[in-house]
Amino acid sequence: MTTGPTGALLVVGDVVTDIVARHRGPLAPGTDTAAVIRTVPGGAGANVACWAAHWGCADVRLLGRVGADAAAWHERELVASGVRPRLVVDPEAATGTVICLVDTGASAERTFLTDSGAALRLGPEDWSDSLLDGVVQLHLSGYLLFSGPSRAFVATAVESARARGVPVSLDPASAGFLVELGVDRFLALVEGVDVLLPSRDEACLLTGLPDPADAAAKLSRHVPLVVTKQGAEGALLAHSGTVHAHVPAEPATPRDTTGAGDAFTGAFLATLLTGADPEKAAREGCRAGAQAVERVGGRPPGRE
């Protein structure tokens, strides 16, 4: 775990309620499937912020949009995790909800059913340049690219960050939603982003290449630094069209892979803010990812 980062990390992204259903083996269509079900706070943006705070970043801020139904609960949970939340309460939409179906077999693989609710209604009117006061890194959840208002928000935030010289990182977030958005459109929307943190599937989808190393290299011609998260196969770092490092994964016994990529991203950014090089930051990301898969839900353990 890292300590002593200077300056704040501002994360902008989704804050949702996760309903995690852990079942063993295939679902039984038309009848009952036994499961262990829990309701926990989630959202890719919120998870990244919590893991960054857990990994030693002393000033983590989160901007997100929620419904009045769960705003107070989410704010309490974020504060308890060491995050400074700025939650916009939507007067019409409910807080986003995600049903996470987790197969408790060896891979602990998960499938998401997503009702974005208020999360993707963040718009340019929710942005203020003052949000960057004291901020040395802006991180955007890729889910923001999957609705019109939040796409406009991303353009406004990136323009503001570039004007201030604040680096911007982005996690594509969802291979399924990327297919709907379109590769060319996504690449145009991330113009101006400094660090891209795709999963292996997302990197291959964005380039049309089957090999993740080739995909990372190609993406790094569009974005200065690409960090491809590969789960049990670690991470790849590429820039200027070349893969420069392969960081191995930490051993883990998976219970639930929900939020593993968010844990990687949070720890990676927290470490990067200490002045560490990207390879060391990726090693810390792999450590956090290993911790995450051994827990249920996408958040780190609570503070003592």
Regions found by a protein language model. Give the residues of each.
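Conserved beta-alpha-beta core of the PfkB/ribokinase-like small-molecule kinase fold
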Residues: 137-214, 233-235
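Glycine-rich phosphate/adenosyl-contacting loop at the front of the ribokinase-like
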Residues: 1-61, 70-73, 253-254
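Alpha-helix C-terminal capping/helix-to-coil transition sites in glycosyltransferase folds
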Residues: 133-134, 191-192, 222
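Structural alpha-helical scaffold elements that stabilize or flank donor/cofactor-binding regions
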Residues: 130-131, 188-189, 219
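Conserved phosphate-binding/catalytic region of the ribokinase-like
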Residues: 1-10, 159-163, 210-304
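Active-site metal-binding loops of divalent metal-dependent hydrolases
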Residues: 14-15, 143, 263
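Conserved N-terminal subdomain of the carbohydrate kinase-like
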Residues: 29-34, 54-140
